[in-house]
Amino acid sequence: MASGLRTLARATLTRHARPARANVARALAGVAPARASPAPAAGTRSGKAPVRVAVRARGYPTSADVKTMPSPGRRHGDLPKNFEHEAVEEGLYQMWEERGYFRPNESATGAPFVIPMPPPNVTGALHMGHAMFVTLQDVMTRSARMRGRKTLWLPGTDHAGIATQLVVERKLESEGVKRTDMSREEFVEKVWEWKAEYGGRIQQQIKRLGASCDWSRERFTLDDGLSESVLEAFITLHDRGLIYKGTYMVNWAPKLQTAVSDLEVEYSEEPGTLYFFKYPVEGGGPDDYLPVATTRPETILGDTAVAVNPEDDRFKHMIGKKCVVPFTGGRTVPIIGDSYVDMEFGTGALKITPGHDPNDYEIGKRVGLDIINIMNKDGTMNSNCGKYNGVDRADCRTQLWADMEAEGLAIKAEPYTNRVPRSQRGGEVIEPIVSEQWFCKMDTMAEPSLKAVETGELTIIPQRFEKIYKSWLTDIRDWCISRQLWRGHQIPVWYVHDSAEDLARAREGDRKGASKRYVVARNDAEAEEKAKAQYGDNIVLHREEDVLDTWFSSGLWPFSTCGWPNEEAPDMKNYFPASVLETGHDILFFWVARMIMMSYGMTGKLPFHTVFLHGLVRDSQGRKMSKSLGNVVDPLGVIADQGCDALRFTLATGTTPGQDLNLNLDRLASNRNFTNKIWNAGKFVLYSMEEMTDEERVALIDEGSALCADEASIAKLPLAERWIVSKLNATVDHVTNAQDKYDFGEAGRSMYTFFYDSFADWFIEGAKSRLYGADAEAARVTKAVTLYVLDRTLRLLHPFVPYVTEEVWQALPHRGEALIGQDWPEIGAFVDAPAVSSFENLQMIVTRIRNARAEYSVEPAKRIPAVIVATDAQANSAYGAEINLISTLARLDVAETVVASAPPDEVAAAPENYVQIIVNDSLEVYLPLAGLADPVKEVARLTKQETKMQKEIDGLSGRVNSPSFVNKAPAAVVEKARKELSDLEENLAVVRSRIAQMQALVSK
């Protein structure tokens, strides 16, 4: 039969460039890297059915030797001074991927943890939005993997119909070729050529962010498996009566010549003009008219009514009369009353153009107005526009207004700020038009999706977005699913014609064909079989040329990637539904809600039970990043400069669920320093082991675990060790709980505080006296505990900063092949509350002494004497035992420092010679003034300070006591000035007291 039918081949799988080899010997501490394997293709493109390729040479490493094999690590001298991210990131990533750590651990006993990656456009280049979702999803994935769950983070890319077509069209135009110069098949071939060359770019860029997703399962929305899913979904929905062809208003992109989704339309405030003109009343004289205002005078040619508010006394008497549409040969339209009309806008009379305005379209449907289309698909005026036929819409506006002025119909034109709809892809002005398209009924599909939130089966974080979600689904409109593009999922509809001649005539008069008869099928053969069964043998088939909206295939993503419609596919059984969907709040309706509706419709299940929404990444001033503002921060540039870990930690710790993040470049630099702090902590631990043999270093691994194993073991440790282990255990619980609540910012900040404050600034600083003291056994205990705490801290930090933690862990003595495969620190471990309290008191002692040293400008290296008075016997004993630690941290002269239960006689006899520091009701510290500073120099310094402060007080006092200032200035300003004066006077009193103290010492 002569069918005129042709099925376009679709390339279904992506190919990716083999990553550059990197020497990972440093990362593996002597373990030779496996031979590199090429990245798997996502499919093939040929006339035959493609074979899905999966390179799985090595699965998740679970053997006992890999999990427990010991390594002494490296030597301190082997490590560079600072963390060199550029030297390790590629090698570590390659090691993780090649050794199978990104695949699900099939032997894991925990519940599966599955995240479907929101598929970025295959045309895309990495931006901060990608960096945000990759960071957060990787934090979740790495944490779940370490917590023993069978973890799958499933990656992929979207074919991005409009974006890709636009990119390829621009490339062809640069070569002097237009899309219309070639056939559809030739253009599609060019698209596939482009994808083969550039399609893997976004994948490689996502890898630069450390994404630990299973690349062996990578999917593409046009691969064969997903194409089969799309066909099945369309046919299923059509068979249920949910897909239909109808006429409706759509967003039309004249240059692309396709309908676009609401998401692909961006509104911008732009300077424009509001045109006021006379709408002549039929049968009236020159003064019989309705004054009307419009921003688009060219659409007057498509008016089918003029509306006034029935409550408007100026015009309500004209309801029922008719107006004559200018330049249409006398065509008349009714004047109608409608409460929609805003009496305060413009003139209070509204021209109604149902064919080119969404609001007018709704009014027209409600009152039964005609719909007149005045534009061709390319944005030129059509034959309904008389002499303006063929004129571009923008030129028509200018010409028509000039004609209105010439005819005396123009009243005035004044500046007006318009909200202009523009194509997100091409930037062109979108034209609302009424068009015949394919639609999907949404009200029925929305019901179970609404119920899921109402019953709590689906949780949206943050919760406030549940209200938005419900509002959208409650007032949902049918979804326009057809697009007039050449690339994408071609709609599986075949129109039925009686003959080839009939088809040819239909094509001349109607792009879609005049026949309303059609069949829905999976392929040519099935279409022919169905058509013959319904209409007989003497027929010709013509396939629908439109393709499906990209969001249609994306809406199937959570289950199509797992093998649906094959319900028995292993991944459908093991990894569907997903655990969580993480994405930006801006696509909650356009993608998330549609996935939920499609999943219920196709599988009867929710696609995931939790939706976590992040906000936009803005610049430091809170502005949206854009090329026009010159404020775009390139994540790849940040990675090259500051390192991947610094970027990830900045994004993760700066995020609050659903809130936008203002990206501070200073914070990036600070977090780069944080990664170096982790590096230096590792070097410190290695330096403390420098004299140990490999066997002794390995022995520390198990010794540290034993010393910190439980309450009984921890109780035997010195105070500082009990404190740091307890702080670690409490931090593990807090971080785990925060991550379980998707509060990644709090989790990251908690780890930062523990590492920087507790571990590095307090514990490591204090440990030096024990590590390098005369007591060898105490030194060994401290080494073992320090190694244990750093190991567990690295595990805790790893999901956030994977590279520096892996590199440091590889350098330390350890068991196992890689940090990525280690267990999460124990949750609910013992916290020694009394030890924490005692050490916090010790910290207060040290902090107060440090403050006093700063106030008296004591040189940092100078050690001073002190008297610590603890009236509580138990505390007295505890601080006496920790005198070396206190002296180390506070820079005290340990030989001249005592711990007593009451002030010594020399203090009691001359308290004026001491600085008294009250820590709490039972704890005081006395510092001899003579030991703090040179009295003569200090008197001179303080006297200068006194003079300066007195001058400031005199000036501020005059201002505060001025009736003019008090009576005229705002009350808040006056109160602020009085507070400043009070503070200065208090500080001056302190300075004078110190001068007196020092002068007393000089006189002696």
Task: Tell where the protein language model's regions lie, with residue ranges.
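N-terminal catalytic cores of NTP/NDP-binding nucleotidyl/phosphoryl-transfer enzymes
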Residues: 107-168, 230, 292-294, 299, ...
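Feature 926 captures the class I aminoacyl-tRNA synthetase adenylation module centered on the KMSKS loop
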Residues: 67-70, 276, 471, 475-552, ...
